[in-house]
């Protein structure tokens, strides 16, 4: 599925994958609901990560591609 993701695509975070990740263990594991309930836009991509901007007044966030799903 990561191959389908490109700049400008609308995505949302996958709760189960994000909560069980190494990133969640390294910091506060209480993620805000907008990550899962709203759509975000991919601003930039690397091999493993995407920079996602959610349409709330917060900074953009880097998430692993396997922690994202395309929004419908």
Curated annotation (Swiss-Prot):
Would the keyword Iron turn up in this protein's UniProt record? no
The gene name on file is ndhO
Q: What is the lineage of its organism?
A: Bacteria, Bacillati, Cyanobacteriota, Cyanophyceae, Oscillatoriophycideae
Q: Which reaction does it catalyse?
A: a plastoquinone + NADH + (n+1) H(+)(in) = a plastoquinol + NAD(+) + n H(+)(out); a plastoquinone + NADPH + (n+1) H(+)(in) = a plastoquinol + NADP(+) + n H(+)(out)
What function is annotated for this protein? NDH-1 shuttles electrons from an unknown electron donor, via FMN and iron-sulfur (Fe-S) centers, to quinones in the respiratory and/or the photosynthetic chain. The immediate electron acceptor for the enzyme in this species is believed to be plastoquinone. Couples the redox reaction to proton translocation, and thus conserves the redox energy in a proton gradient. Cyanobacterial NDH-1 also plays a role in inorganic carbon-concentration.
Chief location: membrane
Protein known as: NAD(P)H-quinone oxidoreductase subunit O
Q: Which HAMAP family match?
A: NDH1_NDH1O (MF_01354)
Q: Which UniProt keywords apply?
A: Membrane, NAD, NADP, Plastoquinone, Quinone, Thylakoid, Translocase, Transport
Protein species of origin: Rippkaea orientalis (strain PCC 8801 / RF-1)
């Amino acid at each position: 599925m990561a191959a389908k993701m490109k700049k400008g695509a609308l995505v949302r975070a996958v709760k189960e994958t994000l909560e069980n990740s190494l990133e969640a263990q390294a910091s506060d594991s209480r993620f805000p609901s907008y990550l899962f309930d709203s759509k975000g836009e991919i601003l930039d991509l690397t091999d493993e990560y995407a920079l996602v901007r959610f349409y709330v007044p917060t900074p953009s966030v880097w998430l692993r591609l396997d922690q994202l799903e395309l929004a419908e």
